[in-house]
Amino acid sequence: MKILAGPSSQLLASKVAKEIKCDLALVEFKKFPDGELYLRIADELDGEVLIIQSTVTNDDVISLLQLIDAASDCYVRIVVPYFGYARQDKQFKPGEPVSARVIAQSIDADEVFLINVHDTSTLDHFKLRTRRKAINLSAARIMGNHLRGMHFESPLVISPDEGAVQLVRDTAEAMKAEFDVLVKKRVSSEQVIIQPKNVAIDGKDVVIVDDMISTGGTMAGAIKLLRSQGAREVHVACIHPVLSQNARLLLYHSGVESIIATDTIERAESVISVAPLIKEGLQIR
């Protein structure tokens, strides 16, 4: 088997190659003046490939499809660490496409692995050659292990809403730390406050965990809130560091101590590699 690195996941693919002791094939990329993308697999393939490519941008989606086509004579295993368009997993308004389904059904492969996909219903949209189901891997444990090594003082792991509770619970378990969730509590007919559901935060180091940080607006509000309620330090951690627009500035302006993320999207904050997780996932047959 050879590993084909897409343009958005070159460093991660290199790490996976080392983890599984597999050759990394040379892939050439370029963009024409009119915006069209070109790629070429410059090495010979041996019948089985592992393509690793996050689909952060539209160009990334096209590059993934081009890689699949270029390797179509092989048994194709694909890892999409960050699966773009996953948030459009249903029709929210009449006339909208289910974009997650559109992208999933365009992927012609034998096996597909995603990492902490926005909604696991997306897995049902893949129509794989082998008739297998796409697999969703969770990076909660490796993120929790990394956070435990940061030696926080009285750590408390917080979910910014009910939607991230399972991820936060699993992360906290790996950290051997308490966890809680922010909830809205009505104190009068006109006033609603947001606070942790069960655990007092005064004097604790708080880590807010979510699957994704995009614009940073939700996280920024939570940081300010926890600071005002007596947290000693507030850190944020996520699987997918989209970090669009001025997200970093917004988070640091709100008082965050650090931004910690995995390399499903390769950013400066990507200090946790999912390469070992991918190695484990590939053993699932």
Mark where each language-model region is.
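PRPP-associated nucleotide enzymes
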Residues: M1-R285
